[in-house]
């Protein structure tokens, strides 16, 4: 049995507006949401994962400090977090390739249709 709480959603992004919108949508569907505004270092990210125990993580590609690619690779190589689905998001046209290179489970293009956020969350936390 996983120690992660399926209803917990971790959003990692440096765009506060994007975080706020995603958080609001997910909270209205009764998901518990934790926001990590950017990723200063891997210890911070792993600490949040250890404490919050997300059932899914949405990871931005472009962030100051630790890149989304490095953070996703670390999550997927760490025994604590390797089974947690990571959904990669970016405004770049090649988001699918970026997600694959990072080892993410799926991807979501920024400026997405909001039901797609809910669809992916429900699919990976079911």
Which stretches of residues belong to each language-model region?
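Non-catalytic signal-transmission and effector/linker regions of two-component phosphorelay proteins
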Residues: 1-8, 115-126
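Receiver (REC) domain active-site loop signature in two-component systems and cognate sites
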Residues: 63
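Acidic, metal-coordinating helix/loop segments flanking the phosphotransfer/catalytic sites
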Residues: 36-56
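Two-component/phosphorelay signaling modules centered on CheY-like receiver
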Residues: 16-36
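Acidic catalytic/metal-coordinating carboxylates
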Residues: 67-73
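Active-site residues of response regulator receiver
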Residues: 59-60
